[in-house]
Amino acid sequence: MSDKRQSSHVQSQRIPESFRENSKTELGACGWILVAASFFFVIITFPISIWICIKIVKEYERVIIFRLGRILQGGAKGPGLFFILPCTDSLIKVDMRTISFDIPPQEVLTKDSVTISVDGVVYYRVQNATLAVANITNADSATRLLAQTTLRNALGTKNLSQILSDREEIAHHMQSTLDDATDDWGIKVERVEIKDVKLPVQLQRAMAAEAEAAREARAKVIAAEGEMNASRALKEASMVITESPAALQLRYLQTLTTIAAEKNSTIVFPLPVDMLQGIMGSNH
């Protein structure tokens, strides 16, 4: 964790190579003349010029100040109150808060030749405002486009079953890939999530039919096991009753009681127990 924080701090302090070279060069005679003229203009137009020269940078912002096209020494500045010269100075504000955007649905051909539609969401923030301004024209647009291509490339190497079961692993791989790719832009990709995986209608029907067939097969197996267990129990009960005349008599009386309680209109002709024992003995 400390290594990540240290690398994050180092990345936030990086400055472009071109800025390092330019910072060593002087403004030149013409440059200093223009700067002096700007100071003179501020003085003669004071206090009106104060409204033009004073800029406020909020807590979640950083500002890059250019003087005659060169980034001022120190790179990004803020938050606080800053003074700029008219005509020679310009500034760009960069929002340092976390930004989220949706990856539009992407048509992806999986490794097992199944076409699916996948979308997601990415969370990122600008970690180095100087790199985000100096190294790329539009860091937000570039990150969005790179997220789309990364999503297609990551899912194109996976089977459908892997995509459906390993979403978190795929999202983590995408986050790592995006973070490395946007490092030179001063962007820190914090999180990537896969929102939805849409399958073709025919494939959905086939998977539903397969699942239904599997459920029916399991139900049949359970029913068959129940019948087999019931048959074993009946066989064991018949053997016990055959060996014990008293048990047969009790079962006989219990059956008569049940019939009399449920169907009062039924006429029962009881048979002698000895006859029943003879019948069961002959069958056995």
UniProtKB/Swiss-Prot annotation:
GO biological process, one term: positive regulation by host of viral genome replication
Molecular function, one GO term: protein homodimerization activity
Intramembrane zones: 32-52
Disulfide bonds: none
Modified residues (Phosphoserine): S18, S161, S244
Region described as Required for homooligomerization: spans on this chain: 265-273
Tissue specificity of this protein: Expressed in all sensory neurons of the dorsal root ganglia. In the CNS, expressed in many neurons of the spinal cord, medulla and pons. Expressed only in scattered neurons in the cortex, hippocampus, thalamus and basal ganglia. In the cerebellum, expressed in all Purkinje cells (at protein level). Widely expressed with high levels in heart, liver, skeletal muscle and testis and low levels in lung, brain and spleen.
Annotated lipid attachment (S-palmitoyl cysteine): C30, C87
InterPro entries named in the record: Band-7_stomatin-like, Band_7, Band_7/SPFH_dom_sf, Band_7/stomatin-like_CS, Stomatin_HflK_fam
SUPFAM superfamilies documented for this protein: Band 7/SPFH domain (SSF117892)
Keyword Cell membrane: yes
Residue span of region Required for lipid raft association: 267-269
Protein name in the entry: Stomatin
